[in-house]
A protein has these predicted regions:
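Extracellular/luminal ectodomains of metazoan preproproteins built from arrays
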Residues: 1-29, 56
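Extracellular/luminal ectodomains of secreted and membrane glycoproteins with large N-terminal domains
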Residues: 1-4, 32, 54, 156-161
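Eukaryotic intrinsically disordered and solvent-exposed regulatory patches
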Residues: 16-19, 39-41, 53-57, 115-122, ...
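Extracellular/periplasmic catalytic domains that process cell-envelope and extracellular macromolecules
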Residues: 22-25, 61-63, 89, 125-129, ...
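Von Willebrand factor
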Residues: 23-136, 141-147
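VWA/integrin I-like adhesion module and closely mimicked acidic/polar interface patches used
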Residues: 139-161
Length: 161
């Protein structure tokens, strides 16, 4: 009679997914936030919350990532320069304190402001790091021809119903 002791591996449960590490490469990010009439107060508040959660994953506190923000409707509303907030908490506070206004969707005015004012050294833009512009809107600009910009790749993030 022969006896064998064979170890059969017990399947282990799949570990839960780990959160992604914060973005570590240097980057200057400008968020362009639509506050036009079609957004509505509720969606504007949801967008602020989303943006606050998003920036918590960025490496702002080390200075690796700089963030700015522009709101728009009939024109440019709030403008927060890239060198205005050196911590996640400070930028989140600025986001959550934004007040909703109404108006048309003049995306072209906001993008022109980003190009001429935000992406300058005076506003904290660094010439040696990539720039990223994230537009959060619920629809098309009231002036689509003026909104078209050369050499910019758009990745729309839909906000709305």
């Amino acid at each position: 009679m022969f006896a064998y002791n064979v170890a059969v591996p017990t399947p282990r449960p799949t570990p839960p997914p780990q959160p992604l590490p914060p973005l570590m490469c240097p980057v200057d990010i400008v968020f362009v936030l639509d506050e036009s009439g079609s957004i509505g107060t509720s969606n504007f508040d949801v967008t602020k919350s989303f943006l606050s959660q998003l920036v918590s994953r960025l490496d702002i506190d080390s200075g690796n990532t700089r963030v700015g923000l522009v709101t728009f409707s009939d024109g440019v509303g709030t403008s927060i320069n890239l060198n205005s907030h050196a911590s996640v908490r400070s930028f989140q506070s600025a986001i959550l304190s934004l007040r909703y206004s109404q108006g048309q969707t003049f995306t072209h005015d906001a993008l022109a402001h980003v190009r001429t004012t935000m992406l300058t050294s005076a506003a904290g833009d660094r010439s040696n790091v990539p720039n990223v512009v994230v537009v959060l809107t619920d629809g098309a600009s009231n002036n689509p021809t003026a909104t078209q910009v050369k050499n910019i790749v758009f990745y729309p993030i839909y906000n709305g119903r």
